[in-house]
């Protein structure tokens, strides 16, 4: 089977191409990582204070509850998954420690950090640890209290008729905590999520400042090193797992680890394939979708497709060049004020035109894209926002992150899967990841249902591209 993944890059600041280059314009790995050992794990306290003040100002009133994450057990209580802090908590407090919760009073202007100090038993196993008060000062917060006082603070506010603003929970323990604090059944929490808070957090987090841009560029530099390692290791006889292990190690060596589970597969027609047991074969293609997080948890995300034996066949090159042309065109279109859904459609049109030249599609390609026929080959959207999450703020909801009152989600195949459709603005960071996939099960389904009949040449598709 032939499978081509996305040629993916990032759009930063004024929606321009992300550059990670040394002074002479060439990548120099020794220089790129020279200062990595001196990096902090937080911005200065005033950064977080400024963000919280802006959140309060825009929201106007009420109590804003921002719970951090807790440790999550893997297979028994004492053996936990690597800790990952909630990204919104990180944005407003910067503290990458489990068991904290932040409260912002939008009326009084007061910030509070709730948590527990470490016990002597903790210190025996973990060594000396900073106090809750010391941690709070790093975030510009002076008032701290134990978690038992959080419940009392929330109860007092509710009794006074004040609104408690909170975001949609995505972890079970956070759902249960919010349920207990607010007196709302877990299955009913979604009805009480603060839409004003969701929209305000998105509006703040989606516009990256210079500090954040630098962190994302650093994440992209780590991601570059990961993908260069793939290119060095990719050859017949290598097991996918060897490459996956090597690049995951690079992500951890220079940052906080991978930004999502690495996809390293010569069966690239499966979009999110986390099986790494195949032996690479000459004539096949290796798809790698992988990225890294910095120590501050800012993310990168790149996809590349590599011929296992170092040389594309004519068929493979034809498809690859179509994807590359779509990628290049979307970079040209990216600018403040541009609609991201129009960039998606432009990429879709280039893919459709290219496939028509190969005989895989026929007829009027404008009409073909309008009905979503190219989604047989690119069943996903063009890309997504990126920042403290690789799919930035996806937990808050795509209807707030990718769409707004001006831009509503389409039901057309392909466009319906687009995570982001709204206008671009300076400071947004976007991925651009067009791709062509040959997915046998999807081809079977569409052909059986009579979809795109007269537009897609199913006979040619099966005879030359599903081998």
Regions inferred by a protein language model and the residue ranges of each:
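Positively charged N-terminal leader segments that act as targeting/secretion signals
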Residues: 2, 23-32
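Cationic, low-complexity basic patches in intrinsically disordered or flexible, solvent-exposed regions
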Residues: 8, 22
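Periodic, rod-like helical contexts
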Residues: 18-21, 35
């Amino acid at each position: 089977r032939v499978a081509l993944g996305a040629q993916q890059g990032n759009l930063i600041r004024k929606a321009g191409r992300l550059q990670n280059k040394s002074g002479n314009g060439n990548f120099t790995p020794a220089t790129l990582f020279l200062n990595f050992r001196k990096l902090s794990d937080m911005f200065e306290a005033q950064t977080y204070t400024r963000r919280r003040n802006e959140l309060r100002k825009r929201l106007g009133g009420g109590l804003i509850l921002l719970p951090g994450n807790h440790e999550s057990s893997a297979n028994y209580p004492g053996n936990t998954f690597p800790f990952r802090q909630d990204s919104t908590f990180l944005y407003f407090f910067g503290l990458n420690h489990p068991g904290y919760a932040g409260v912002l009073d939008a009326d009084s202007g007061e910030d509070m950090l709730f948590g527990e100090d470490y016990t002597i038993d903790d210190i025996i196993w973990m060594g000396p640890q900073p106090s809750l008060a010391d941690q709070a000062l790093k975030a510009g917060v002076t008032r701290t209290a134990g978690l038992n006082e959080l419940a009392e603070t929330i109860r007092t506010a509710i009794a006074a008729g004040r609104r408690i603003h909170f975001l949609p929970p995505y972890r079970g323990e956070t759902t249960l905590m919010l349920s207990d604090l607010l007196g709302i059944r877990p299955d009913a929490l979604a009805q009480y999520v603060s839409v004003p808070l969701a929209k305000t957090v998105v509006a703040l987090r989606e516009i990256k400042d210079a500090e954040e841009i630098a962190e994302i560029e650093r994440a992209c530099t780590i991601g570059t090193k990961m993908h260069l390692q793939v290119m060095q290791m990719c050859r017949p006889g290598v097991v996918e797992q060897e490459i996956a292990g090597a690049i995951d190690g690079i992500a951890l060596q220079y940052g906080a680890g991978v930004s999502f589970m690495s996809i390293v597969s010569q069966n690239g027609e499966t979009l999110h394939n986390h099986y790494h047991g195949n032996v690479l074969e000459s004539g096949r293609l290796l798809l790698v979708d992988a990225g890294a997080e910095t120590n501050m948890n800012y993310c990168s995300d790149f996809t590349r497709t590599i011929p296992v034996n170092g040389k594309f066949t004519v068929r493979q090159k034809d498809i690859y060049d179509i994807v590359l042309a779509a990628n290049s065109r979307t970079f040209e279109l990216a600018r403040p004020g541009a609609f991201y859904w129009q960039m998606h459609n432009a990429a879709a049109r280039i893919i459709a035109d290219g496939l028509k030249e190969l005989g895989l599609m026929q007829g009027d390609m404008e009409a073909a894209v309008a009905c979503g026929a190219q989604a047989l080959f690119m069943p996903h959207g063009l890309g997504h926002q990126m920042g403290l999450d690789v799919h930035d703020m996806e937990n808050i909801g795509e209807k707030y992150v990718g769409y707004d009152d001006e831009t509503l989600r389409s039901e057309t195949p392909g466009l319906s899967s687009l995570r982001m459709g709204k206008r671009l603005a300076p400071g947004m960071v976007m991925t651009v990841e067009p791709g062509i996939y040959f997915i046998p099960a999807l081809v079977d389904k569409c052909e059986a249902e009579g979809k795109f009949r007269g537009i897609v040449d199913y006979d040619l598709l099966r005879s030359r591209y599903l081998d």
